[in-house]
């Protein structure tokens, strides 16, 4: 009996080390950033079983077999749609400003279409204004309404939006609503899904959380886009979820969430519509390609129209494009670069681009919330401050709530607004969307918003920062090491 126990023990030990060796080899063979690989290896060697289970669950990008097959199947029809859209030459910009040209050329080469012109944009900073405008647009809708959000939290004005959407469906408007399963868990546990479906709205729970399939699909891959399209002509996107900030996370101790949304009219709605149709097909298997822009209602003749490029990320979309866009924007800056983000855990390349911009004389500012709803990200962000301050970057800590706006402004002319946080999850994993806008007028509007944020912020003093306690430095370095995984 002792011999059997000994044999079993040796086999268990051998299997244990073979498993560690196999996972180690898999990590090394994957094309990933060195810091990310090193962080995973450290976890696996310190906490082997926990590390291996965690890596198999969230260490690699698994969309899931069924969704991956749908993503592959949709691209021939999507590519044909994009090729047909090119026939509408009047909607595409032929020239861009010097600061925006490199980024727009990158997007055109990687996504297959140029930026679209003739759009009218309106920046909106108050959630009440956004929802009231949206309710009016829903009430005036004639054909279709499509929405996708990471979070839909019942309560307050979000319920008024839901009521108006159901009223639209009852009068024959085709309404589709896609919500992330994890982000909108409160919504899916409420009566609202059944009420909406009974009214005729197609409601889809995207990327359902299922612990039984944790090793078949990455559970922390999330649908993080916030988009609304109405009648192939009106569109919204930005950082705001479908929540009333007066009712949302009031016990988090960070204050109300501060967001930014853009309301648009023009062919940009079509460009965003194809992104939505791809998401819808990946999730449901149903194809809903949008119609081409209606030349009879598009404001092409208006010289004040904005030129916009949509940048989409996520499985099935051009790999690393949003990361490349941010790098290109940083390297294109000559006068100033202003960034706002709630979660700042940049890649080494992005950190280097930001610091290099400051070191070559660009006025670089980063606006972050002083209080963060994620302790891990908050500490990890601090680990980058010393290097940023040494390079001459100004760090503003916003004190008026949780600044949730995601924006970049380059030389007052190139603007980036959307859903992308400056962290690994947004840059490499989630379904995200960013708008690149080449327009001085819009840049001035965004600059005014960012100036308002700065007026409600505290500038981080480099000398005081260097005097912070030793325990804070240790905590920052610890979280910094694991930052590639956050």
Swiss-Prot record:
GO terms for biological process: cardiolipin biosynthetic process. It is a multi-pass membrane protein. The keyword Nucleotide-binding does not apply. It catalyses: 2 a 1,2-diacyl-sn-glycero-3-phospho-(1'-sn-glycerol) = a cardiolipin + glycerol. Keywords: Cell inner membrane, Cell membrane, Lipid biosynthesis, Lipid metabolism, Membrane, Phospholipid biosynthesis, Phospholipid metabolism, Repeat, Transferase, Transmembrane, Transmembrane helix. It is an enzyme of class 2 (transferase). Residues 219-246, 399-426 form the PLD phosphodiesterase domain. It is found in: Cell inner membrane. The chain crosses the membrane at residues 3-23, 38-58. The active site is at residues 224, 226, 231, 404, 406, 411. Its EC number is 2.7.8.-. GO terms for molecular function: cardiolipin synthase activity. It comes from the Bacteria. GO terms for cellular component: plasma membrane. Catalyzes the reversible phosphatidyl group transfer from one phosphatidylglycerol molecule to another to form cardiolipin (CL) (diphosphatidylglycerol) and glycerol. Belongs to the phospholipase D family. Cardiolipin synthase subfamily. ClsA sub-subfamily. This is Cardiolipin synthase A. It comes from Shigella flexneri.
């Amino acid at each position: 009996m002792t011999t059997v126990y000994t044999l079993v023990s040796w086999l268990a030990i051998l299997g244990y080390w073979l498993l560690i060796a196999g996972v180690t080899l898999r990590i090394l063979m994957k094309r990933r950033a060195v810091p990310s690989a090193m962080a995973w290896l450290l976890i696996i060697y310190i906490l082997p079983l926990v590390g291996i289970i965690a890596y198999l669950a969230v260490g690699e990008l698994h969309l899931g077999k069924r969704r991956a097959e749908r993503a592959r199947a949709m691209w021939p029809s999507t590519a044909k749609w994009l090729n047909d859209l090119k026939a509408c030459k009047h909607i595409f910009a032929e020239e861009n400003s010097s600061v925006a040209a490199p980024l727009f050329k990158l997007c055109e080469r990687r996504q297959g279409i140029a930026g679209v012109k003739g759009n009218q944009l309106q920046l909106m900073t108050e959630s009440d204004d956004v929802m009231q405008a949206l309710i009016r647009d829903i009430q005036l809708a004639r054909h279709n309404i499509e929405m996708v959000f990471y979070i839909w939290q019942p309560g307050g004005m979000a319920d008024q939006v839901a009521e108006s959407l159901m009223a639209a469906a009852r009068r024959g408007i085709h309404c589709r609503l896609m919500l992330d399963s994890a982000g909108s868990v409160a919504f899916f546990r409420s009566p609202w899904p059944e009420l909406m479906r009974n009214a005729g709205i197609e409601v889809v729970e995207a990327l359902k959380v299922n612990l039984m399939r944790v090793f078949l699909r990455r559970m922390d891959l999330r649908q993080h886009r916030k988009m609304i399209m109405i009648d192939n002509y009106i569109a919204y996107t930005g950082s705001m979820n479908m929540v009333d900030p007066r009712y949302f996370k009031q016990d988090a101790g960070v204050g109300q969430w501060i967001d930014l949304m853009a309301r648009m009219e023009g062919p940009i709605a079509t460009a965003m519509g194809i992104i939505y149709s791809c998401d819808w097909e990946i999730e449901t298997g149903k194809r809903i390609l949008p119609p081409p822009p209606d030349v009879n209602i598009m404001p092409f003749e208006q010289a004040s129209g904005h030129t916009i490029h949509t940048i989409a990320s996520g499985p099935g979309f051009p790999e690393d494009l949003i990361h490349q866009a941010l790098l290109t924007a940083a390297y294109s800056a000559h006068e100033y670069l202003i960034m706002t983000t709630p979660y700042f855990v940049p890649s080494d390349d992005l950190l280097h681009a930001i610091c290099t911009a400051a070191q070559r004389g660009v006025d670089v500012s980063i606006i972050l919330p002083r209080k963060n709803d994620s302790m891990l990200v908050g500490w990890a962000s601090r680990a980058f401050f010393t290097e940023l301050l040494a390079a001459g970057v100004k760090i503003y800590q916003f004190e008026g709530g949780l600044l949730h706006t995601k924006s970049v402004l380059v030389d007052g002319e190139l603007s980036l607004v959307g859903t992308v946080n400056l962290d690994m999850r947004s840059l490499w994993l989630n379904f995200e969307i960013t708008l690149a806008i080449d327009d001085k007028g819009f840049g001035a509007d965004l600059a005014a918003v960012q100036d308002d944020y700065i007026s409600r912020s505290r500038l981080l003093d480099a000398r005081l920062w260097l005097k912070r306690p030793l325990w804070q430095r240790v905590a920052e370095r610890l979280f910094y090491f694991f930052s590639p995984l956050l």
